Amino acid sequence: MKLFVLAAVLGVCLADRLDNKYLPPRGNAGAGFGPGFGGAGPKGGGSGFGGAGSGFGGAGSGFGGAGSGFGGGAGGGFGHGGAGSGFGGQAGGYSGAGGAGGYIGGASGQYSGRGGAASADANAQILRLNNEVTAEGFAYDFETSNGIRADAQGVATNGVQSQGSFAYKGDDGQDYSITYTADENGFVSQGAHLPTPPPIPEEILKSLEQNARDEAAGIVDDGTYRGEGAGAGGAGGYSGAGGCSGGAGGAGGFGAGGAGRAGGTATSASEAPTTTIRLM
């Protein structure tokens, strides 16, 4: 047993250090998988899986050096973007310099599909801000570094009457602006990019004009259905002299009578023609 322990101790003492040629090359500021999945390693800062300048823990070796990694420079996250690098470090990779794109924007490690635009919005500064409120009314205006501007003024007379504007820079680089008024007539906005109602078809326009003329002339059509000839006597219809039913004494009808009788009475049975059928 003592011999076994002694041999183990001698083996450990005589064990040579693993030569660097059996390990991946040492990382530097421009390559590797560095700062890696969690920022600072368990034995130091700025490296990949291990501590400073080391890999899994061996001094002078490791998978990545300071300032490299999936997320870019120091403090970069796990993603395509980051401060100045993509997959390969500061000098190259899938994205350009300065956090211009990628799923991880800048050193904050936040998700951003818009890349640099989202970073500009998140870091926008207020350039101007004025706000004044009195018993008679109010007025305010502000402007930010990412192109947002707004202003409004209003007075408390017969309710609240106000007017103002709002503008911003879109993702396409164009400026969009809206002006508005709000008073007893409601909220009315104007802007070049706002949708407009389609034109009224010519047939509908003519119908509306005709309805307006009829209403001015006292003709009212409420859309109720009225059958043809309903409530009307006269020459046509089911009534008339010699007809099946009385009427106002017109000329026609179902009956075969001539001039008819006053009041439109039906033809008597004695006056009607008869047909005799003889059985042999």
UniProtKB/Swiss-Prot annotation:
What Gene Ontology cellular component terms go with this record? chitin-based extracellular matrix
Q: Where is the signal peptide?
A: 1-15
List each copy of the Chitin-binding type R&R domain by range. 135-198
Key words, A-Z: Cuticle, Signal
Taxonomic lineage: Eukaryota, Metazoa, Ecdysozoa, Arthropoda, Hexapoda
User: From which domain of life does this come?
Assistant: Eukaryota
What's this protein's name? Pupal cuticle protein 36a
Which PROSITE patterns does its entry note? CHIT_BIND_RR_2
Example GO molecular function = structural constituent of chitin-based larval cuticle
Q: Which InterPro entries match?
A: Cuticle_Struct_Prot, Insect_cuticle
Location of region: Disordered: 258-280
Q: Whose protein is this, by species?
A: Manduca sexta (Tobacco hawkmoth)
